[in-house]
Amino acid sequence: MSQKFNAILLDLDGTLVNTLYSLQDTVNKALERFGFDPVTLEQTKKYVGIGSHKFVERSVEATANRLYREAEKWEEKDEDKAFDLDQQADEVMEQIDDVHDAYMEIFKENCIYKAEPYPGMRKSLDALKAKGWKVACITNKPMAEAVTVLNHAFGEGYFDYISGDDGTHPLKPDTGVVDDTLNHIGCKKEECIYVGDTNTDMETAKRAGIKSIGCLYGFRDKKELEEAGADVLIKSAEDIGKAIEYFEAE
């Protein structure tokens, strides 16, 4: 039986590589420079996925929201104190761009901190490459750091194409990145499968009209992936082959 598919497109953070610690460590170092609250690993999981600027914005917003909540508590007791807290929160939000600049500066050196491919990922991709499959990464991570992380985790030249945030195009879930990637690797939408761990990934695949695999081992939960329309869910990167067999049998 001939195979229906010949290309796999994968997200990076939470799908190919566990980068959670590098993301948290980097943003917390940036937040610390400005005296803002650090974020937890759980917050980091929720905040990432729509690009570095949005990640930083959400992380900064956590401090601002704490101040807004404190202001509400003081409204009846001390209006002046409540006003001051509101002002502080507003000032925090005004510094998002500055925090992002600091984040990007730190991230250049910190992007591979504790970053490792998920168990079974290399084996699964090697098996596909042995069958002649094209393997590409589509990420909202800054391009330079995406390449650095992938080279660190898989070796230089492992991927047929890498699409990252280079500031010249819309990010996922915009499907332009899918079209661009398929053009570069010479494959059609009906011949490829998309693998990711967030609602953004599933939405990208759905908009593009391609099959999707949702990764339960990544940064988001089953409920989010199901609601976002994942075609198949896997608990481990080792299960990618089984998911593809399911699609092949349809």
Regions found by a protein language model. Give the residues of each.
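Active-site neighborhood of HAD-like aspartate-dependent phosphohydrolases
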Residues: 1-46, 57-58
